[in-house]
Amino acid sequence: MIVTTTSGIQGKEIIDYIDIVNGEAIMGANIVRDLFASVRDVVGGRAGSYESKLKEARDIAMDEMKELAKQKGANAIVGIDVDYEVVRDGMLMVAVSGTAVRI
């Protein structure tokens, strides 16, 4: 499945705009506290363990969005947006959304 942040796909014609699709992932209540604990883990200015948690959450949300698009008969998603939010009790939410299309 093609997934892009742009409104179209170069060299492809969108033949049907199907629906808005989304996916969310919420990571454990200790993620913010763990961020500060992982300061020891900083190498070259990057917090490796925190980045891996962000990637894991983003991958889960993206997979959920792709599966929903597939169920609706789409073979691509355009205009995707990825948002990161710290919600109550220090939980991290990653939300992705886009438009499911058929090319």
Curated annotation (Swiss-Prot):
Q: What Gene3D superfamilies does UniProt report for this protein, alphabetically?
A: Hypothetical protein apc22750. Chain B
Out of the domains of life, which is the source?
Bacteria
Family named by the database record? Belongs to the UPF0145 family.
HAMAP family given for it? UPF0145 (MF_00338)
Listed name of the protein: UPF0145 protein BT9727_3206
The organism's taxonomic lineage, starting at the top: Bacteria, Bacillati, Bacillota, Bacilli, Bacillales
